[in-house]
């Protein structure tokens, strides 16, 4: 971050003249970009580049990696919307896209693409439009799947810009329109190559409207004449073109090559995999390579690489040949005479038939009539030396020709263009080292036609040197190594390869000859006939009559002699002006294709007889004769075909260069670099701006052409790998053949050894036969012995079967005996079990008899005690009244306590309701536990309500029981005797009630704490424990209004010694005293208790029931022992307060019972 603090200083150091400082600062910026993820540094670099146009900053921006790609695209999207920075940012986008970054697939989803399309739809600046169209054309092969979203936008842009080329808005300079037309032509090629069905459908729908018909006729239709019928138009569909699966297997250079394959333009089409042009085409133009450096136009064409050319209208083409425009250029070029054969062309039947695409001829041309294009020019097919259609090469040199046909050889060799570092060396073209660039350039400046002029050849070389200065030496070494490898792999012979239709057909010559004728005319015009062309014409005239059947003959007689008339010169000047801008199809050079190794010219009609049917050949011959007659009748009338926009642009640059050099040669200025206009003064501002814009457009066009050249070079490297693999496979096949021969020798040796083995086998066979006869005799003897042994074994087998049957019978008898023994053992065990059961029953009967005798004695003792007493009823009634009063008070207090408990229960209900509300609030946050918590809360509420209802029912039962007891005591007349006992019992009950109240509160508090500790689960103590804390409870529930009093539980030291005082003093006729145990889970009170504490689990209730049952059995046994020991004791007095034994006043019968019996009585 400390380095980013002084970004301004670092940016200023980027433009330092010291390479070390520049490299260090660049490294710092790259490291900062790798560590910094924010957009600040990228935005600063973009702003600085827009201000200074710094090349180091451009290098950093074009090598950005993820995630800074999003920041760069967003920043460029922001500046595209501003008119002031739109051109600069489009140039930056072009630089970034041409390097094909790793994140190029994100361009289809970035907002920059819609902004670019909107700019191309809305902007009116031609420079911006041309730059944007070239950037879009470069991007389309990288993001072909974007056509599914923006296809209509691409078509709208094409329709808008194509109409501009015709309507010519008033504020647009004519020179700009030439560049725009060339870029629109390139866009046409790209859209037609990638989306032919949709594009043709758009053209059909868009240009069927009346207002667009003129645009179609003048602009679009000439473009369509230079493309083939796309195969997708036959086999594909609109949806298939937009299917992303179509582009998955294609890389960027594959898409570019596929688009180039459908072009008929020789500078745009791709020649590979059999796309060869007949050597006759190269023989027709023997001076193309010789004159390649004498014209500024030719090198511009080479710098463009695969610059395509489309037809244009005649009116627009003739604009440049009118005397009012560029007169000096035309006059300077027209004053130089040209040989007649270089102005001629071929007649094309497509122009007459109205066909936009000439039909391709079948690829069945014999091998002796055509040669591979690459090998015909001395290059290797598929090797590093690229075909002429690729941008990586300049026009190839001419094939070997006779000495008189190579008149321009010495001059052309002296001024040959040195190959640039992008060019690929081949075996037939000498490789000039880089040190020869300066002398060659100086030699060019000495030529008459280029004296004092700045040729356009130096511009792409200079730009290429700036762009790739660092890796130039490595590329030179790589090219030399590849050239050496190619020379080792491939042979020098030109193997015959069947050419593909289209390039070998006669119609292809029409599209190719225009640019080549232009090249010859411009080259010869620039040289100014420095070499006498008469040997060439004499040779052409000499070879002319040798042709037996000429389908196309020249219209004008050969010219170029020194004694030509002035009228003839004027005619040649006029024809030259026409041929420069609009090459004529009605003229053809008299020379024909020269086959390699011979001077004979093969007849042209032989190609038609092979490539086309007889009817087509007859048709072409007939048309040729008609044209010849028409040309002889009116030789001045020439058919003017369309010229491609790229050719117009090239000729404009050529003529501008010629006019510039001519005007500078006329001016007598001391320094031509200072004052360079026609008038010798400073140029006007608008002219400077126009020239700068034109230079920028040319630079953008060169960058686009360099991109295409790089894609072709990448393709060529892939083809080189294929050639290497093919050579390796050939070597592998040769090795396999050698192995096959060795294996054949081995087979012969194995055959000889096989014969030897067969002879040996026959000997062994004879030996085997003798051995077999001996063995047969031994076998017969052994068979006889075997039969004897077999008879003996049969006898033994019968004896064995008899023994087995006897054993089976014995086993059956043994099983029967075992079954009888088992049955006897079972009966014995049953008898012994019955005996043990009878003994236990007998012991129980003896125990019960003893207990019956003891109980009878106890009963007699109690009867004697009752008979010996003399009760005083008056005193007893008073005491009973007092006791009942106290008991009434106690019941009232008990009722008060019950009310308090009811209030507590209500408060508990309120607490539970509040707890339920809290639970409901909690349930909103915990959706997973909604049902469980809701059921628990509702269960708690129901338990509290059921407890309350049960408590009320118990209270009512107790009141009824009290009233019933009062009624019984009054009937029996024992109220007076029981008053004293009641008073004492009331006091004891009050004490116990106090203790019970304290214990209840403690137990209730403990229960609440336990319930709160288990997340709302209510846990109750055992029913027995509840009774122990709450004191004794009187329970009654019989249908016959009979009541039973239960003994309350006490702490363990007093649990079995308590008594109920009022009942102990009853007479013998009263209800027997009941000593009760805790209720079980199936008794009446047990069910009530379970209703009070419903939230307790069933398993706990069952366990409690089992514990209470065992406890009741223990209580019965202990009380039985106590009753047995009471016979020898004197009963205590009534006033004795100790509750450990029954009172002496109690005369009733002692009854041991359980709550289970009460439950059965109620049921």
Curated annotation (Swiss-Prot):
The gene name on file is Tsc1
Q: Could you tell me which residues carry Phosphoserine?
A: 487, 505, 511, 521, 595, 598, 1097
Q: Where is this cross-link: Glycyl lysine isopeptide (Lys-Gly) (interchain with G-Cter in ubiquitin)?
A: 30
A Gene Ontology biological process noted in the UniProt record is:
negative regulation of macroautophagy
Compartments (UniProt record)? Lysosome membrane; Cytoplasm, Cytosol
Sorted UniProt keywords: Chaperone, Coiled coil, Cytoplasm, Isopeptide bond, Lysosome, Membrane, Phosphoprotein, Tumor suppressor, Ubl conjugation
Task: Tell me the function of this protein.
Answer: Non-catalytic component of the TSC-TBC complex, a multiprotein complex that acts as a negative regulator of the canonical mTORC1 complex, an evolutionarily conserved central nutrient sensor that stimulates anabolic reactions and macromolecule biosynthesis to promote cellular biomass generation and growth. The TSC-TBC complex acts as a GTPase-activating protein (GAP) for the small GTPase RHEB, a direct activator of the protein kinase activity of mTORC1.
Protein name per its UniProtKB record: Hamartin
Q: Which organism is it from?
A: Rattus norvegicus
Compositional bias annotation for Polar residues: 295-316, 512-530, 1066-1083
- In which broad location class does this protein mainly occur, judging by the first location in its UniProt entry? membrane
Q: How does it sit in the membrane?
A: Peripheral membrane protein
Q: Which Pfam families match?
A: Hamartin (PF04388)
What is its quaternary makeup? Component of the TSC-TBC complex (also named Rhebulator complex), composed of 2 molecules of TSC1, 2 molecules of TSC2 and 1 molecule of TBC1D7. Probably forms a complex composed of chaperones HSP90 and HSP70, co-chaperones STIP1/HOP, CDC37, PPP5C, PTGES3/p23, TSC1 and client protein TSC2. Forms a complex composed of chaperones HSP90 and HSP70, co-chaperones CDC37, PPP5C, TSC1 and client protein TSC2, CDK4, AKT, RAF1 and NR3C1; this complex does not contain co-chaperones STIP1/HOP and PTGES3/p23.
